C-alpha cells in the first residue's frame, strides 16, 4: 500500500473517530476514503466498520452503568436480537455484489445525511408520541435497526436513538447507553461475519483502527469545547458533499 493511501485512510479514520465519539457519522469519511484508495465498495464498507469497532466497544463500556432496557424488553433480549440483526445485515452485505452496492451507497448516504440533518426534530417528534410497553414492536425495531447497522454503519446511531425515543426511552443518557451497547454488539458480530466471508481488506485495517482510537480520545476532549450545532452542521456538510460525489460517480 502506498504511503499516500495510508495517509488518506488514517486521516479519515482519525476524524471518523472524533465525530463518532461526539455524534456518530464516521462512515461518511471512512467509506469514501477507502473507495478512493482503490478498495472495492463492499470491502471498503466492511473494513471501515471493523476499523471503528474499538470505538464502539469503548463507548459501550463507558456507558455501562446507564444501560436500561426499554419497557417490554430485557437487556439480554436487546443484545440477542441486536446480534441476530447485525449478523443478518452483514450476511446481506456479503451477498451484495460490488456493482450493486456501488449503486446503493449514494442512497444510503443520502438517507443517513437527512437523518443527521433532521435528527433533533425527529427525536422531538417521536418523544411527543412515544408509548411504553410495546415489547413485540420493540423487538422488531431492534432487529430492523441492527440489520441496517450490520449492512451499513452510516447514520446507525441516529436511527437507534429515534427508535428508543419511540419506545419510550426519554432519558437521552439512557438512550445513548442502549445505542452504544447495540452498536458494539452488532458490530462485533458483523465484523466476525466479514472476517469469515473474507470481506475485510487487512492491509488498511491496522492504521485505520489505530487512527480511529486516537480520534476517539481527541473527540472526548473536543466535545467539551465544540458547540453541538457546529459539529452537527459540519457532519451534515461532509455527508452532503460525499453523497453528491457518489451520485455523480453513479450517474455521471
Segments predicted by a language model, with ranges:
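Structural signature of hydrophobic alpha-helical transmembrane segments
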Residues: 5, 39-54, 100-109, 147-155, ...
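Selective hydrophobic functional segments
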Residues: 47-100, 187-230, 234
